[in-house]
Curated annotation (Swiss-Prot):
Glycans are attached at N126, N162. The lineage of its organism: Eukaryota, Metazoa, Chordata, Craniata, Vertebrata. It is linked to Hirschsprung disease 3: A disorder of neural crest development characterized by absence of enteric ganglia along a variable length of the intestine. It is the most common cause of congenital intestinal obstruction. Early symptoms range from complete acute neonatal obstruction, characterized by vomiting, abdominal distention and failure to pass stool, to chronic constipation in the older child. GO terms for molecular function: chemoattractant activity involved in axon guidance; glial cell-derived neurotrophic factor receptor binding; growth factor activity; protein homodimerization activity; receptor tyrosine kinase binding; signaling receptor binding. This is Glial cell line-derived neurotrophic factor.
Length: 211
């Protein structure tokens, strides 16, 4: 808890304790019927005299004051210990924020060392950039397959690779698993700069796999 939160809680407790009714043993006895008229006239003086008597407050007031003092003392000692109570994830996050260069370096090394496998990658291009001879301002999202298929190798693929390495299959060319599209996007329709209508089929990958 922050200091202001604790102070607010203490003020609420103090207000609650001051609002408690007086104990039964400390309530003033009721005046007889004939003296009520006189009691009404003396009421302002009685209230002023009672307000100056701290012994009429309930015993909980002293407990609340002790609690407030103990809480303030604890807060003065606690800032140095708050770091030890934080979870490990929070401490690591604070350390990374203090040393951004170190955290970036570790993240880059981790990405380089991790094998992504065969994944689908997207890039924003103009249809003219595809190199198919179209002159147009039409744009598209081109998706292609990239990555390694080493993790998808079967025992058959390993045997063929070993036989090729040992030159046991010299006369035959053995193909390896490649990361290629196994499904394609919908056809793309567009007009070129000469207002000629064209349709591109199987132009962009939709799903990838090792084949």
């Amino acid at each position: 808890m922050k200091l202001w939160d604790v102070v607010a809680v203490c003020l609420v407790l103090l207000h609650t304790a001051s609002a408690f009714p007086l104990p039964a043993g400390k309530r003033p006895p009721e005046a007889p019927a004939e003296d009520r008229s006189l009691g009404r006239r003396r009421a302002p003086f009685a209230l002023s005299s009672d307000s100056n008597m701290p012994e009429d407050y309930p015993d909980q007031f002293d407990d609340v004051m002790d609690f407030i003092q103990a809480t303030i003392k604890r807060l003065k000692r606690s800032p140095d210990k708050q770091m030890a109570v934080l979870p490990r994830r929070e401490r690591n996050r604070q350390a990374a924020a203090a040393n951004p260069e170190n955290s970036r370096g570790k993240g880059r090394r981790g990405q380089r060392g991790k094998n992504r496998g065969c994944v689908l990658t997207a890039i924003h291009l103009n249809v003219t950039d595809l190199g198919l001879g179209y002159e147009t301002k039409e744009e598209l999202i081109f998706r292609y397959c990239s990555g390694s298929c080493d993790a998808a190798e079967t025992t058959y693929d390993k045997i063929l690779k070993n036989l090729s390495r040992n030159r046991r299959l010299v006369s035959d060319k053995v193909g390896q698993a490649c990361c290629r599209p196994i499904a394609f996007d919908d056809d793309l329709s567009f007009l070129d700069d000469n207002l000629v209508y064209h349709i591109l089929r199987k132009h962009s990958a939709k799903r990838c796999g090792c084949i």
